[in-house]
Amino acid sequence: MLLKRLCFAALFSLSMVGCTNAPNALAVNTTQKIIQYERNKSDLEIKSLTLASGDKMVYAENGNVAGEPLLLIHGFGGNKDNFTRIARQLEGYHLIIPDLLGFGESSKPMSADYRSEAQRTRLHELLQAKGLASNIHVGGNSMGGAISVAYAAKYPKDVKSLWLVDSAGFWSAGIPKSLEGATLENNPLLIKSNEDFYKMYDFVMYKPPYLPKSVKAVFAQERIKNKELDAKILEQIVTDNVEERAKIIAQYKIPTLVVWGDKDQIIKPETVNLIKKIIPQAQVIMMEDVGHVPMVEALDETADNYKAFRSILEAQR
């Protein structure tokens, strides 16, 4: 049980900051071994694609190539391993789980555009290269949700369903009290010290899994190293409103599942009301005592909700 808890904790911490060459080599090596163990359990293989820009996009893919493709998009500060554990419960689908440009093992150019439309274009290039750009199901958490909306709005005839998990981009709903007054200088999502990381870890989740402080310190150093790029990306995404684009999803009646943690301190849970207004066909599920990352905090329930949603779609065909 202790090993399982440590595996889970190390997995989430890596998913929040990516692989690292931080000073604590023993902690890093141990965590990377755990991550690889979890990827293997989920039948995930790590691959990469060189984009037309010359940048590298790294992604995880499971072995179920006969299943319907499901693109899963992580949020700010995360990477593909946000979905590694839940991936084994979604094994019935052909999973494509990328590191967005600027995160994880993908390239991190300072000069790039990191808004939803630019990331959407890169993801479409990836899917085209794999021959999966049509009949695709798309899901995303936080920033990944905004990118999912942008993708579906651009390619509405190709997207068969949409899964929004505590989605960013619906900014007219306002911000939670916990972030009122936050700036690029004092934002809890931007890490400038070990202590910032410790606070962020508890802030993002309502019931964060246990993680040894020594391991937290290792990952804090990686976030500190990337703080300038993180600040640039955050500055771009907080002004990237996808509400107008979401209206296209309503027009095309793309089946949409909206999932939210009722204890989310990053994006107001009341945002679901705005999304439901813009996308009337959306099914909304509010998860009790869950924070900003349901697929990590409550992966069983999150997976069950999604599979039930997909089962309904199958029955309607």
From Swiss-Prot:
Catalytic activity annotation: a triacylglycerol + H2O = a diacylglycerol + a fatty acid + H(+)
Residues with lipid group (S-diacylglycerol cysteine): 19
Residues of the active site: 74, 142, 270, 292
Keyword Hydrolase: yes
Location (main, coarse): membrane
Entry's localization field: Cell outer membrane
Membrane topology, record value: Lipid-anchor
Pfam family, any one: Abhydrolase_1
GO CC annotations, alphabetized: cell outer membrane
Disulphides: none
Signal peptide location: 1-18
Residue span, AB hydrolase-1 domain: 69-296
A GO term, aspect molecular function: monoacylglycerol lipase activity
SUPFAM superfamilies assigned: alpha/beta-Hydrolases
Temperature dependence: Active at temperatures close to 0 degree Celsius.
Biological process, per Gene Ontology: acylglycerol catabolic process
EC number: 3.1.1.3
InterPro entries: AB_hydrolase_1, AB_hydrolase_fold, AB_hydrolase_sf, Epox_hydrolase-like
UniProt-recorded name of the protein: Lipase 1
Organism: Psychrobacter immobilis
Lineage: Bacteria, Pseudomonadati, Pseudomonadota, Gammaproteobacteria, Moraxellales
Gene name linked to the record: lip1
